[in-house]
Amino acid sequence: MLKLNNIEFYNTPSGGVMVSVEGQEAFILLPTHYDLISILHDYIMQNYHGAYLALSSLYKGSAQNPSYYRYRIVSRFARCNFGEYETNVVDISKHTFHFEQVHCPLRGTGDCQLEKVVCNPQYTLPLTKQQINIFRMYADRLNTEQIAQRLSLSTNTIDRHRSDIQSKLNLHSITEMILFWTNNNLK
């Protein structure tokens, strides 16, 4: 089974998307790469819901052909977020997306309706508002006691929320929580 780990993407001059998976020869992403497209499509849909909705609306004309429809969504997402060839940090490692500032002639002009929706999208957290608030405080380097004091809750309640956050996001420490917050540009 394909895993979202050690994958690098980059745009070709002709507009294609090259994919380099560790241990494999690089290839151009095509609609026939069902396994990779399927796992990326599902991950985008679950974790970058705003970007997914925008792209699914943009490509709704292709929805009658599901594999091509998913390919178009994944290809555009990759072109807008992983298009630069980067040798220092892979684009996807351990189910974490490392977005790049892809050069785009439309960036900052107001001409692209998908700017800041698809490119560098906001991560969709499967957390309650209270959990997000507590997560944000940990990311701001507050400790459990400080968070409990600010929210007028017991440290046991804060620990329970932290445990729930870590469980939902498959994180194992406060350090991993902070890295996750930072890597996903959460606010």
PLM region descriptions:
Residues 35-37, 45-46, 120-122, 145, ...:
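Generic alpha-helical propensity signal that fires on short helical segments
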Residues 93-95, 151, 170-171:
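Alpha-helical interaction segments
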Residues 161-164:
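Residues within the DNA-recognition helix of helix-turn-helix
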